[in-house]
Amino acid sequence: MAIVLRTVDFSETSLIVTLLTKDLGRISALAKGARRLKGPFEGSLDLLSVCAITLIDKPGDTLDLLTESKLRRRFRGAQRSLERLHAGYYIAEMLRLLVDDDDPHRELFDMTLSAMGMIDGEGHVAKTLLAFDAQCLRLLGHSPATQRCTVCGRDAERSRRRASFSLVGGGVVCENCRPSQSHLMTASWDALDALRELASEPELPPSTIDADTDNPSQPPSTAFPIGRLFPAMTPAIYRDLRGLLNRTLESLVGQTPRMQPFLPDKLDSL
């Protein structure tokens, strides 16, 4: 199974396709004939389409060859609203920036399917993107520290209304260590509490523990119920947390994602 993250024209008839796969991680492959009107890929290579693929592994720096792709689920966010379309584009961009080539993360794949299902359906866009970002950080080993100081390791006291947060250290900094640190921002403790919930591991109902996400008829949230992570929050907490995640991700990838300005600026974004 694979999710289409990007396509780039290679020739008059072919594409270079970037895919997030469940078993191989992020890969790039050459899809010969994909630009033909009646090509061999049956319209399965649209952005964020979920497809079953067949690859020929090429040695060295040569691109793998994508020989077959069968559409399993098409992303239809654009038919719902511009905001849902932008959310889908943001997910694709962040996966390209955060995930290394040939580094499989099966749980990340399941989480992405779940987030896309929420955006493609009736899910809350703003909260889904918060959970997506927080889970990307957790699953890729960058989950922010929200309770213990990233410098000394002690519990950070909540003596101030807002906590100091290190973009370099990836978490809170206590009052004793704060003067020696740079690249700090502040965040409310309520926002950090919400982040901790969003970055937690979701509990699976017993009936879905062995769910098979390769089954296209199965709801995309079955294997990773991302909607269970949504905490209660006020508009002020949302703005604070959205800003914290934006700055954290910028620091991690070394740039401002192109789709970041199009993220929901209000909590009530559906």
Curated annotation (Swiss-Prot):
This is DNA repair protein RecO. Involved in DNA repair and RecF pathway recombination. The keyword Iron does not apply. One of its GO terms (biological process) is double-strand break repair. GO terms for cellular component: bacterial nucleoid. The keyword Transmembrane helix does not apply. Belongs to the RecO family. Keywords: DNA damage, DNA recombination, DNA repair. Pfam families: RecO_C, RecO_N. InterPro entries: ARFGAP/RecO, DNA_rep/recomb_RecO_N, NA-bd_OB-fold, RecO, RecO_C. SUPFAM superfamilies: ArfGap/RecO-like zinc finger, Nucleic acid-binding proteins. The lineage of its organism: Bacteria, Pseudomonadati, Planctomycetota, Planctomycetia, Pirellulales. Residues 202-221 are annotated as: Disordered.
